[in-house]
C-alpha cells in the first residue's frame, strides 16, 4: 500500500498551529459566554509570566538589539520553546538544509488549543462593552506630619519629647546625616523633588504581592490601520503591510550590511506621529466614549516593563480630554550614535527586508534602498483591568494561515548567544519581546541571530505564549506581575489627573517611584483632534 504523501515543510512555515493560536482566544471566549470565567489572572499558585519595544510609536522598529551583553544598543530579541523536561537550546538550529523552519505540529490538550497564549495566567479574556467598575478613588496622601492623631500624646510609637523617648524614632533624616527624605539619608539624602510635582506612585509592592493579584487582559481587537509610504504620506489602509517570507532560512549567511550606503534613517516625527494615529481613528468614526486611554504601544511597553526594569529612565505626556487620557510618546536625550551604533540599527531593518516578500527584488539580488520611514500601523482596542485602551502598534509583517486567517509576525535581530549571554537574554530581552507582542496580540516572533560583523548566522521562530512559559519555569519573570503592575499605574493615573490638564509621567533615578509632574502645554495633535471631534466642519485652532 502506498504511504500517504508527505507534506512539504516549505509549503507552510507556521503549520497548523498558527491558525489554532491566532483564533484560540476567540473560540474560547465565544464558547464560555461568561467573560469573567475566561478572564486571565496572575496568581501566586500558577506563577504568571511576563513583559516591553518602537513603532512610529517607538517600539524599536527594525533596530537591531545589539550585543546580548551590551546595556542598550537597539531593541531586544528572541525566544525559544520550553517544556517541563525538554528545553530547546537557543543555539540549536533546527532549520536543517531545507532553508525553512521545521514547524512540527504541537500536541496540545483541547483547552490549550482554544487559547492563543496557552492556559497560563496571561491568556486573553473577553469582557463586556461597558465597564462595571467605577472610577477609582485614591486614598488620602501620606503625610510626614505626626503631631496629630494616634501617637501624638504620651510615650507612644513615636517620640514626642514627653516622658522619655518613644518606642521608635520619629520618621525623618537620621541624626547628623542631613537630607530631607524620611528615614533614608545616605544614598537618597540629596533627592530633590521637582517643583512641578503633582503626585507619585511609590513602587513599594513586592513582586510576590503583585503575582497574587488577578488582572484581566482582553484579547486585542483590530479596529483600523494606516500606512506611511515613501515620501511620508499617510494612507488609511494596509498598503504598507509586508508579507512574511516563509523561506527566510535561505538567507542564512547573508550580509546585513548590504544597502547600508543608501539607508534612509527614521525621522523623529514627535507628536505629529500621534496625530496620524488620531487621524486614523477619526477617519473610521471610531467612538472614544468608553475609552480610558489612547496611546502608542511603546508607552504600554514602558509601563509594563517597569515592573522589572528598574534602570532605564523614561517619560511620557499625559493629557486628559473629555474623560479620555492621551499618552504621548516622549523621547529622552540620547548619547550621539557611533557608526557601529548606526550599523547595528540598520542590521535590524535589513533583516526585515530579507524576511519579507519584495516583488521588485529578483532572486539573489542584494538589498538596497531601505527606508525606515515606511511603516504599517495597526490600531487595536483592548482592556487592562478596569480600563479600556485604544492603541497604535507598528507591525513588521503578516502571514496567512491555511484557512485564510491573517496574523502578524514580529521580526527581531540580536547577536548570537553563547554561554555567557543566554541568561541575560532570557531575563531581559525575552521580557521585552513578550510585552511588545502580547499587548498587541502578535502570536509569533522570528529572530535573526547575527555575528559581530553583521552576518546572519541563523533564524528561529518563537511563539509569544512559550516565552512566558519558559521564563516562569526558570523563575526569571512573570507576565502576571507586569499586568498587575500596569493595572496599578493606570488606576493611579486615571484617578489623579484632572480634566483639561496636562502632565508628564516620568520614571527616573533612583527608580523607586513614578512621578506625575505638571506640564505647561498640550501637543497640537491632541488639541486639533479634540476640536475636530467636537466641530468636524470647522478648521482646527492655530498652533500654540
Curated annotation (Swiss-Prot):
Catalytic reaction equation(s): a 5'-end NAD(+)-phospho-ribonucleoside in mRNA + H2O = a 5'-end phospho-ribonucleoside in mRNA + NAD(+) + H(+)
Main location (coarse class): cytoplasm
Cellular location(s): Cytoplasm; Nucleus
Co-factor note (free text): Binds 2 magnesium ions.
Gly residues bias locations: 53-64, 149-166, 175-186
Entries under InterPro entries matching the protein: RAI1, RAI1-like_fam
Positions annotated to bind substrate: 272, 296-298, 377, 394, 412, 436
Start-end of Basic and acidic residues biased regions: 1-10, 78-91
GO cellular component: cytoplasm; nucleus
Family, as annotated: Belongs to the DXO/Dom3Z family.
Name the UniProt record assigns to this protein: NAD-capped RNA hydrolase DXO1
Annotated source species: Arabidopsis thaliana
